[in-house]
């Protein structure tokens, strides 16, 4: 088993550090009661002169920041222990007897023991895909895989160096035993990469039982406006639509739907693709046609480097190369088309194992509902739709529910048009205001009627039945 054989904490399995499971995304194999703190370093931020011929990676600054990050992670463990102590103090102060609160108290004591004893950290990265593009290196290529391996080797050596340095100052994690780790493949790779670091570790120990991981960093990448984790870019550019009023000044109508509503199309750029455009003199304000967008992508370093373009086997091999320098694990997803064969999926799993991956996730398009939805999904001929088909043309009259709600300090009202008791459209506005929508508070339902003025502009009226049975619009 690759995890057990490569795991540094599993060298201490006899002391309770045998891996039994992982966190939900799989990047942290854990023993019972243990936990891990995660931190992600933005690789793109170390590329100087990105998207130019002078682009380079600042390894000097990168090494300094890796060391600082490891120090921060160790400090966070102490802060975490303070919080656990506060929880234990609260449990002790509670009026219930030990037979009631004993289980919870023992749980937190075990969590505290593992955190203090092993001091596990999880230094990771994000923006690997953007970093490679900014350097002019294609994701998934041999050059790209080699450079990624060098990056993660650097992280491993510098993070472990920082942990050894901190051990000199603060002491090693309490169960450190160099004899238990002497045959661990990861530790031996560190020895080969930097013998001085290895012998310093033999002399002083290190502060943390394990230090490295690569998480999905989905939310983190939204903050950094980069690709996530070790993944390539999903799409560098795509088009969206927004509804517009055709009578507004300077409005542009690109599409009119079946019910006569007008839409404007606009281009959404991946932030770093937009930066590439600006560096290379392409306008980011122009309304490009799809053909023009395709030509732009073809000129960019993101060409043939999206999640759908990258060769699946090469991606697995890249993960395996990087995994050699990550003492925990890596969260990676291989996106496959719906019609992929079982044989190919089997080959990917086998290749992942042979490449040295500790885990791999395969997602087949459409294999789970509500996860990812593609535009080209098709129903099988023998599949019967039990739901009423969604109308391609809006009925003139829709039943509607009325919902009143508070928006900060303002009172609002919403009219929800329904088809088969499911929301189809929503109109909202201020309520109980001179300029708002005046409607008796007892009205909870009615009709939304679509009409056209003499000038052809659509309008929507709400109609309800008053207490005397008369229709009011």
Which residues make up each language-model segment?
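Structured mid-domain segments that build the active-site/substrate or prosthetic-cofactor binding neighborhood
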Residues: 1-122, 219, 249, 428, ...
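Catalytic alpha/beta core of large soluble enzyme barrels
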Residues: 26-27, 73, 77-85, 187, ...
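Contiguous, well-ordered alpha-helical segments that form the cores/surfaces of helical PPI scaffolds
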Residues: 40, 119-134, 150, 219-222
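Extended, hydrophobic alpha-helical segments in both membrane/secreted and soluble proteins
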Residues: 124-127, 159-163, 330, 345-348
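A general alpha-helix detector
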Residues: 127-131, 147, 162, 473
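Short, Gly/Pro- and small/polar-rich lid/capping loops
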Residues: 192-203, 374-418
């Amino acid at each position: 088993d690759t995890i057990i054989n490569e795991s540094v904490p599993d060298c201490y399995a006899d002391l309770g550090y045998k891996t039994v499971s992982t966190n939900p995304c799989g990047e942290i194999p854990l023993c019972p009661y243990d936990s891990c703190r995660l931190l992600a370093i933005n690789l793109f931020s170390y590329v100087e002169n990105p998207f130019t011929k002078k682009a380079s990676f600042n390894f000097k600054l990168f090494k300094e920041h890796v060391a600082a990050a490891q120090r921060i992670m160790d400090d966070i463990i102490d802060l975490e222990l303070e919080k656990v102590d506060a929880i234990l103090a609260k449990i002790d102060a509670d009026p219930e007897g030990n037979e009631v609160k004993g289980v919870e108290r023992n749980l937190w004591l075990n969590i505290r023991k593992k955190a203090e004893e092993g001091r596990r950290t999880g230094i990771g990265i994000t923006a690997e895909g953007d970093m490679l593009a900014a350097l002019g290196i294609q994701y998934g290529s041999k050059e790209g895989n080699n450079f990624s391996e060098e990056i993660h080797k650097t992280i491993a050596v510098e993070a472990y160096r920082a942990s050894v340095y901190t051990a000199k100052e603060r002491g090693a994690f309490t169960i450190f035993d160099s004899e238990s780790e002497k045959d661990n493949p990861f530790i031996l790779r560190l020895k080969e990469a930097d013998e001085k670091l290895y012998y310093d570790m033999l002399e002083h120990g290190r502060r943390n039982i394990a230090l490295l991981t690569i998480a999905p960093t989905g939310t983190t990448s939204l903050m950094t406006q980069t690709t996530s984790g070790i993944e390539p870019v999903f799409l560098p550019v795509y088009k969206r639509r927004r509804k517009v009023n055709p009578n507004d000044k300077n409005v542009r109508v690109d599409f009119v739907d079946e019910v006569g509503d007008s839409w404007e199309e606009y281009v959404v750029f991946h932030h770093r693709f937009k930066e590439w455009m600006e560096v290379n003199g392409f306008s980011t304000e122009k309304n490009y046609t799809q053909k023009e967008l395709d030509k732009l992508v073809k000129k960019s370093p993101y060409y043939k480097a999206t999640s759908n373009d990258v060769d699946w086997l090469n991606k697995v091999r890249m993960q395996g190369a990087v995994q050699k320098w990550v003492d925990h694990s890596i969260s990676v997803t291989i996106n496959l088309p719906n019609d992929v064969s079982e044989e190919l999926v089997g080959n990917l799993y086998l290749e992942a194992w042979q490449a040295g991956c500790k885990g791999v996730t395969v997602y087949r398009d459409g294999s789970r509902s509500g996860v990812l939805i593609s535009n080209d999904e098709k129903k099988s001929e023998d599949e019967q739709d039990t739901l009423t088909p969604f109308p391609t043309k809006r009925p003139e009259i829709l039943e509607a529910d009325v919902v009143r709600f508070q928006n900060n300090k303002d009172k609002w009202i919403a009219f929800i048009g329904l088809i088969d008791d499911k929301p189809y459209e929503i109109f909202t506005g201020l309520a109980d205001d001179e300029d708002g929508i005046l409607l008796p508070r007892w009205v909870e339902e009615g009709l939304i009627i679509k009409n056209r003025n003499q000038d052809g502009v659509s309008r929507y009226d709400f109609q309800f039945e008053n207490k005397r049975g008369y229709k009011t619009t």
